[in-house]
Amino acid sequence: MKVDILSREYPPKVYGGAGVHAEELSKVLAERVDVTVRAFDGPRTAADIPAIPGTDPKGSLTVVGYDVPKELEDANGALKTFGVDLQIANDVDADIIHAHTWYACLAGYLAKMLHDTPLVITAHSLEPFRPWKREQLGGGYNLSSWAEKDAYEHADRVIAVSAGMREDILTAYPNLDPDKVVVVHNGITMSQFETPADDDPGWKVFERYNIDRNKPTLLFVGRITRQKGLPYLLQALHFVDPNIQVVLCAGAPDTPEIMEEVKTAFAKLDEERGNIIWIEEMLPKPELNALEHGCDAFICPSIYEPLGIVNLEAMACGLPVVASATGGIPEVVV
């Protein structure tokens, strides 16, 4: 059997939970079947392809990356996405198509019609529940919403990453047959979150960012987007004991405007209480794992979160999680 996984994110271009999901799913599926990942952000090299777990895989893993067509380089973000989708839809060659997020939904829907191939969509978020995306896409938000709606309503199966997400899907798309929508919770590979050895180079992240391992420390990990609630967290931290150190791993802003908003709020907080470190880069996995093992609690202030893989990862590192009760978070934070 051949499965084509369609995703905007895939290593080394991963910035959120959907990318983590796509990577881990592709590796596990490739133990059993032939998998081709068709992803955004340009060609991949052999070094970018993750290793298939297990000693005797029955399948294979191929990764094909696509660039935005030159003619669309200055176009609206949604049109750039559609330019990649058209290339992917043309190339699909599989028994099952599995699309992730609205970015790849149109590719999946077009490929389903073009090649008469069953389409599965995993719902990581929903455009109707993210109105702030209009800040990023402008009128393109109308296009992304249209593409997502059509793809979902014509999919052969829709996977919700939580029970809360399933309810949201059926609310957003009432024409969708409820029997086609199933819940498969996101998971993680526990062995990836074991405590690093004392000489593990990942611990150097504390020295590089001047993080004091002897102080009680709160950790936030997430993109700079309305969804993740970082501006609210920066306001709330004014009321937290200044002796508590705060580390923010926050980058990949949706828009220049929200980046400026966060910079202003951070500067105000830093002036008032200090003891706060902002890491804007995407940390390598060994460093993020060490950071989570070296902190004392994890904060997730999301205002919209279908599941929240970051919470699973934090708990796997033994961190208590303080999270907002939204979406699928109450199903996994226990």
Which residues fall in each region the model found?
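N-terminal subdomain of nucleotide-sugar transferases
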Residues: 1-52
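A conserved mid-protein helix/loop that constitutes part of the nucleotide-sugar donor-binding site
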Residues: 20, 216-220, 225-239
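Nucleotide-sugar donor phosphate/pyrophosphate-binding loop at the beta->alpha transition
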Residues: 117-118, 128-150, 167
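Carbohydrate-associated surface elements
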Residues: 164, 187
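Nucleotide-activated donor-binding/catalytic signature segment of Leloir-type glycosyltransferases, i.e.
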Residues: 250, 259-282, 286
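Short alpha-helical donor nucleotide-sugar binding micro-motif in glycosyltransferases
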Residues: 289-295
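Aromatic "clamp/platform" in nucleotide-sugar-dependent glycosyltransferases that forms part
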Residues: 303
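Short hydrophobic beta-strand element within catalytic cores of glycosyltransferases
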Residues: 320-323, 333
